[in-house]
Amino acid sequence: MSLDFLPFSRPSIGEDEIAAVEQVLRSGWITTGPKNQELEQRFAERLGCRHAVALSSATGALHVTLLALGIGPGDEVITPSLTWVSTANVITLLGATPVFVDVDRDTLMCSAQAVEAAIGPRTRAIVPVHYAGSTLDLEGLRTVAGRHGIALVEDAAHAVGSEYRGRPVGSRGTAIFSFHAIKNLTCAEGAMFVSDDSALAERVRRLKFHGLGVDAYDRLSHGRKPQAEVIEPGFKYNLADLNAALALVQLKRLDALNARRQALAERYLERLAGLPLAPLGLPAHKQRHAWHLFILRIDAEACGLGRDAFMEALKARGIGSGIHFIASHLHHYYRQRQPRLSLPNSEWNSARLCSIPLFPDMRDDDIERVARAIEEILEKRR
């Protein structure tokens, strides 16, 4: 009997989400408006942060954040290479230079020591990455950033619902969350910038919408003059209320969704124990893992086949998988510009990383199906 294809991720969308979107469609106000304002308020309340600004993507959020920080030609921004390449792209498009640092071989996150070693006279910002739902050593990074007077912007795209030392990621400092389709909280496409820096938040809010002092809904609801002024040239990164309505329902469900992810991840850890799959290590500090991804490292010597062949074998059994990520400095554009750069841990992991299915609507027998498929694949290679 053939089984339905099991993707590595699928959004958990219920009747409440559908009803919320329908309500916005029927309201007559479908672009940025009251649902955006409510989402920003609810998100800030949950984190305990001072400011929250909704945007259309985390890439756009990072773009305007770095621009608001004054990053431009001649500047350097430190970031791990082992992350989605949009970070390097945004830095490059601003005329600055991404300075790639290596990650810990097992947590896949950069350390304060690696970051400090990369700081130079042109360093203007640090963009470290919370990885797969696990959390960075923020205290060390904050100390380094403060000592050198450099901005710290947390890439929290994987970390909505994660906690560091008992506090939500994003509750302090500046961070950017993603609401992309595969994230723990989704609105199809979207993001949230959070910060306790009022001036920075005000400029991000302005830059996300043409550089205008106010948006259309703000003018309508506060009775301001109909034609807003451009304070400075900006972009079109605002989030539609259609998306915000979806995100609001997901935010209410976030704890339950993440609890299900944790239960599934724990089952994987039990079921796959003893196999030569090298799951990621956990940092030493206290944290709450959001389990955005469940990642294996497929080493040809240990497993009898390489990562790509392993993924093909899963696909042949109706199981999806993904790669998170190919290190940025290995992409053609950046390899041409830094051909001698060597980051051993990032490169070793880039060749072996494999994300297997993990999403809240998975059943317990889906975990068993994946585990049995993996056992069968490895058994054939022994």
From Swiss-Prot:
Biological pathway: Nucleotide-sugar biosynthesis; UDP-4-deoxy-4-formamido-beta-L-arabinose biosynthesis; UDP-4-deoxy-4-formamido-beta-L-arabinose from UDP-alpha-D-glucuronate: step 2/3; Bacterial outer membrane biogenesis; lipopolysaccharide biosynthesis
Cofactor: pyridoxal 5'-phosphate
N6-(pyridoxal phosphate)lysine PTM sites in chain numbering: K183
Gene3D superfamilies, per database record: Aspartate Aminotransferase, domain 1, Type I PLP-dependent aspartate aminotransferase-like (Major domain)
Database matches in InterPro entries: ArnB_NH2Trfase, DegT/StrS_aminotransferase, PyrdxlP-dep_Trfase, PyrdxlP-dep_Trfase_major, PyrdxlP-dep_Trfase_small
Molecular function GO terms recorded: pyridoxal phosphate binding; UDP-4-amino-4-deoxy-L-arabinose aminotransferase
Superkingdom in the source lineage: Bacteria
Reaction(s) catalysed by this chain's protein: UDP-4-amino-4-deoxy-beta-L-arabinose + 2-oxoglutarate = UDP-beta-L-threo-pentopyranos-4-ulose + L-glutamate
GO biological process: lipid A biosynthetic process; lipopolysaccharide biosynthetic process; response to antibiotic
Keywords, alphabetical: Aminotransferase, Antibiotic resistance, Lipid A biosynthesis, Lipid biosynthesis, Lipid metabolism, Lipopolysaccharide biosynthesis, Pyridoxal phosphate, Transferase
Assigned EC number: 2.6.1.87
One Gene Ontology CC term in the entry: membrane
Function as written in the Swiss-Prot or TrEMBL entry: Catalyzes the conversion of UDP-4-keto-arabinose (UDP-Ara4O) to UDP-4-amino-4-deoxy-L-arabinose (UDP-L-Ara4N). The modified arabinose is attached to lipid A and is required for resistance to polymyxin and cationic antimicrobial peptides.
PANTHER family documented for this protein: DTDP-4-AMINO-4,6-DIDEOXYGALACTOSE TRANSAMINASE, TRANSAMINASE
Assembly notes: Homodimer.
Family: Belongs to the DegT/DnrJ/EryC1 family. ArnB subfamily.
Protein name: UDP-4-amino-4-deoxy-L-arabinose--oxoglutarate aminotransferase
Organism: Pseudomonas aeruginosa (strain LESB58)
Gene name of the encoded protein: arnB
